[in-house]
A protein has these predicted regions:
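Bacterial N-terminal signal peptides that target proteins for export
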Residues: 1-11
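Bacterial N-terminal signal peptides
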Residues: 10-20
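SH3-family beta-barrel domains
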Residues: 21-39, 46-52, 57-102, 107-117, ...
Length: 149
């Protein structure tokens, strides 16, 4: 009886410890055209200029610099003030149909091609995500067709 109770307590403690290790992935978007660097310094090598709205995954935050990963998997550094909390997604499919409802059988609202940036309109659910195009169209895409979730 004591052994079973001790085992349950040990398992509960182990699971609680593992839960603390799990971290939510944080995404942001580029606020304005911003230089991305290979080091956390404006004296580093300039890698590229990121367009406004580009979604990035936050990897590490150091003082005024944030290490980010883009849809291609490239890791670079950006000044903290170059990012916005606004959530955007980047289309990864060659062509994707945005539908009126989260269902393959629902009518198409519009189509997008690879690398188009869309605003996240609502959290993903059941394999679909609601998106908004800069020109105003809103609809649903399969989560496998975008990056930034």
């Amino acid at each position: 009886m004591r052994a079973a109770r001790s085992l349950r307590i040990a398992c509960a403690c182990a699971l609680a410890g593992l839960a603390g290790l799990a971290q939510a992935i944080e995404f942001r978007s580029v606020a304005a055209p911003s230089l991305l660097y290979d080091t956390p310094s404006d004296k580093g090598r300039r890698v590229l200029i990121a367009a406004p709205g580009t979604p990035v995954e936050v990897v590490v935050t150091l003082d005024k610099w944030i290490k980010v990963r883009d849809a291609s998997g490239a890791i670079t550094w950006i000044a903290q003030d170059g990012l916005s909390a606004r959530r955007t997604l980047q289309v990864t499919a060659e062509r994707a149909v945005v539908r009126s409802q989260p269902d393959e059988a629902s009518p198409a609202v519009f189509e997008v091609v690879k690398n188009v940036i869309l605003e996240l309109a609502a959290p993903a659910a059941d394999g679909w995500v609601q998106v908004r195009h800069a020109e105003g169209g809103t609809g649903y895409l399969r989560i496998g067709e975008v990056w930034g979730l």
